Amino acid sequence: MSAQIENSIPLDFDLGNMAAFDISPLDETKLSGSEKESFLFSLSRDNVQQLVNKMISLPKERTSDGVLLQLPETVTPLPRAKPLPKPKPETKWQRFARIKGIAPKKREGRLVFDEASGEWVPKWGYKGKNKELETQWLVEEGEKEKKLTSKQVRNTSKKIKRSRRH
């Protein structure tokens, strides 16, 4: 099934990239004449045939999807479209934290065990432990709140809500 083709200079193959490199010089008379298209077509066909012959000789693996070829490692390194990203410079805070030995808070510090539900819940935020007082239909007044006048109640309502949360 494979056709044997002979070149004066053998091709360089990189089967990992499925590429063949022809370094033989081209015939200038055929490139400038009217046979240019047919010459390039036949040269390309011969080189592709040699590449296919080499690919067929590789070890094969049969799977449910079909026959797969085991490609060897690449020989030619391919260039990247963009340069490798440079490491980001350290911020002032990161430098300060590294010098002082400050570590970021761990996730476990944000959770509290809720004995009523038997699960770990966040301290703050959505479904947090701090929302527990807001959902209760009855909250006892403390001694401090009983002594306040109506004007003081209006002015200190925010303070009371904050003090209950903690």
From Swiss-Prot:
GO biological process, one term: ribosomal large subunit biogenesis
Functional summary from the UniProt entry: Involved in ribosomal large subunit assembly.
Record's subcellular location: Nucleus, Nucleolus
Residues with the Phosphoserine modification: S34, S64
Similarity comment: family membership: Belongs to the RRS1 family.
Main subcellular location of this protein, as a coarse class: nucleus
GO CC, alphabetical: nucleolus; nucleus; preribosome, large subunit precursor
Assembly notes: Component of a hexameric 5S RNP precursor complex, composed of 5S RNA, rrs1, rpf2, rpl5a/rpl5b, rpl11a/rpl11b and syo1; this complex acts as a precursor for ribosome assembly. Interacts with sad1.
Biased composition (Basic residues): 156-166
Superkingdom: Eukaryota
Protein name, UniProt field: Ribosome biogenesis regulatory protein homolog
Pfam families in the record: RRS1
UniProt keyword terms in alphabetical order: Nucleus, Phosphoprotein, Ribosome biogenesis
Species assigned in the record: Schizosaccharomyces pombe (strain 972 / ATCC 24843)
Disordered: annotated segments: 144-166
